[in-house]
Amino acid sequence: MVGSPAKAAVAGPRSVALIGPYGSGKSTLFEALMAAAGAPLKRPGDIRKRVVTTELRLGHCSFLADRWSILDCPGSVEFSYEMEGALAAVDLAIVVCEPTAGRASSVPLLLKALEEYRLPHLIFVNKIDTLAGSFDDTLAALQAYSKYPLAARQLPIREGDAVTGYIDVVSGRAYRYGANQGAEPIEIPSQLRDPEKQALDGLAEVLADQDDALLEKLIEEVAPTSAELYQQLRKDQASGTIVEVLLGSAARGQGILALWKTMRHDVPDAAETAAHRGVGAGEVPLVQIFKTVQAGKLSYGRIWRGVLLAGTSSAPGAPRACRQMSRQACRSY
């Protein structure tokens, strides 16, 4: 069992966009998330036979009874317009990058775009099995790019040069990567006990900067409980005032379940996102079309308000079909 906050109640449908530099493994993460949710995609197993993603991919799935829409955005700058449409429609973005700073040259541009959209986002450091230097150096490089403070949720565990697991900073539990996207609990290696304590203290300080009650506890040298930290993490991540950082290897199925559980706990729901974007309440349906394909016969849209049912008429000239982004699917012919 992967360390996580207390079981969350079933939420309404939510949506996330996966963005990242070309070659970061973003599409592999998309497929790993879908597979972990029981909705595997058909794609050549041999990476050499896979084609480069050149357009938006949309997947629907459920994880622990919560419904999700996941958008896989092309990483090449030539197709950045696909990403821009997605960012206007989702609840949160996941920035996928590699642990080597030199391989993340476009990450600053992505983070800048997210700042302009005022979109909550977290970072998934992919290909953690290729980590060559210090993970602290990776975090420092990412922090230099980010306007918002990073909140490192995990630390890698190494055996020699290999990354074999991770420590969940808040729960203080360690896990070894296993088969089928699993992770088995282990004791925290003795040489990582001090770094784990330092990481926890650093995380608490980041959160205390956002909450006076938590700051007062730290000043009085009272350690906050895990429940308090999880609650503050959820509040700050959903509001976009911090950027959580997780790690794993999508190609190896490592860190996928931990990412799913963080998404389930910390991604804001549709109502929060609508309020954040100034969408007023009401019964009249409000739909944002952010992508049209098949010569206008099919569109991707985000339902911000109300409900659209099959057979609902649309304004003259509107696309003939709408594919679900959140809340409820609609197809009008």
Language-model features: locations:
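Structural and coupling elements of P-loop NTPases
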Residues: 1-333
